[in-house]
Regions:
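Well-ordered beta-strand positions in beta-sheet-rich domains
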Residues: 17-21
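Basic/aromatic-rich interaction segments and small domains that mediate binding to polyanionic partners
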Residues: 6-8, 29, 33-36
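Short aromatic-glycine-(Arg/Gly/Cys) micro-motifs in beta-strand/loop hairpins
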Residues: 1-16
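Short, mixed-charge low-complexity intrinsically disordered segments
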Residues: 34-46
Length: 46
């Protein structure tokens, strides 16, 4: 069974903070970037 963790990711272009379930921090940032159609570099863990 995979363990998922809730990460808080900020989208730098909009200032929006999103909670995202993922296996690790990279997966969380990639998921938010893909879902909100922004570049990975425009996301930051908080």
């Amino acid at each position: 069974m995979s363990k998922y963790i809730t990460f808080r990711v900020k989208i730098l272009t909009t200032g929006q903070v999103v909670e995202w379930l993922a296996k690790d921090s990279i997966d969380a940032r990639e998921g938010v970037a893909d879902f909100y159609e922004v570049d990975y570099k425009q996301t930051k863990l908080i």
